Amino acid sequence: MATDVHRPLSTQKAATAAAQASTAAASAVRVDGLTRSFDGRAVIDNLELDVRPGEFVALLGRSGCGKSTLLRILAGLDRDIEGTVLVPRRKAVAFQAPRLMPWKKVWRNVLLGLPGKPERAVAEQALTEVGLAHRSHAWPKTLSGGEAQRASLARALVREPDLLLLDEPFGALDALTRIKAQRLVGELWQRRGCAVLLVTHDVEEAVLLADRVLVMDDGVIAYETEVELDRPRDITDPRFAELRAELLERLGVDTAAEAA
């Protein structure tokens, strides 16, 4: 069930509320006419977006185009907007910086923010799922970058999200750790079945993981394409390379010069 995190459905006219409820059942995310301005400048400008339940969507775009702002709005962290945003009640977000509390053991970090008094076993289960059970009693400062990011993912997973929001979660990782983290996220998504919105600058990562790739420019979704490639994706597949090149061109990268 989705809710409008910015404007209660009860304030809408009955017909509008009924239509939104129907749309929510068919969508994990529904955004209509979203505008977000800073100092009179629209960073997001009358944006429309749908994400289907269980769909993995990657969002590309140059720095400053509004990607992270959109993700923060979907997460409910920024509500100074115009327009309508419908998202699931159960959602979670993981950022590039894991944001672990240094004075709490890893398993306690995983449980941060959960209502009630969840048992340690809840954290242990999530840590096992991300391959970090052996570090549950460690202090965050002793974790590697990849381990810290996995702890952040575990903290998101314990919320049993219907929507997982990922804001460049692999950006600070070295190449090998990044590949492992990408594989882990893909496996978690297939196992959990939740909708995922991944904000990234990495075109190859987007094609590798997503069902659909969006390109954001000047505050709107300027382009989108389905990734009609079998899983697991093969980066040596000519169709993979073609789609990567097409997306790079949409982002203003001269692929002919890149090849040269």
Curated annotation (Swiss-Prot):
Catalytic activity as recorded in UniProt: ATP + H2O + aliphatic sulfonate-[sulfonate-binding protein]Side 1 = ADP + phosphate + aliphatic sulfonateSide 2 + [sulfonate-binding protein]Side 1
PROSITE patterns associated with the record: ABC_TRANSPORTER_1, ABC_TRANSPORTER_2, SSUB
SMART domains according to UniProt: AAA (SM00382)
Superkingdom of origin: Bacteria
ABC transporter domain ranges (all copies): 29-243
Class in the EC hierarchy, top level: translocase
Topology class, membrane: Peripheral membrane protein
Ligand binding (ATP): G61, R62, S63, G64, C65, G66, K67, S68
Location(s) in or outside the cell: Cell membrane
First-listed, main subcellular location of the protein, grouped into a coarse class: membrane
GO CC terms: plasma membrane
Gene3D superfamilies reported for this sequence: P-loop containing nucleotide triphosphate hydrolases (3.40.50.300)
Enzyme Commission identifier(s): 7.6.2.14
GO MF annotation, one: ATP hydrolysis activity
Keyword Transport: yes
Keyword Membrane part of the UniProt annotation: yes
Keywords per UniProt: ATP-binding, Cell membrane, Membrane, Nucleotide-binding, Translocase, Transport
Matches recorded under InterPro entries: AAA+_ATPase (IPR003593), ABC_transporter-like_ATP-bd (IPR003439), ABC_transporter-like_CS (IPR017871), ABC_transporter_ATP-bind (IPR050166), P-loop_NTPase (IPR027417)
Assembly and interaction partners: The complex is composed of two ATP-binding proteins (SsuB), two transmembrane proteins (SsuC) and a solute-binding protein (SsuA).
Family under the similarity heading: Belongs to the ABC transporter superfamily. Aliphatic sulfonates importer (TC 3.A.1.17.2) family.
Primary role: Part of the ABC transporter complex SsuABC involved in aliphatic sulfonates import. Responsible for energy coupling to the transport system.
Protein name: Aliphatic sulfonates import ATP-binding protein SsuB 1
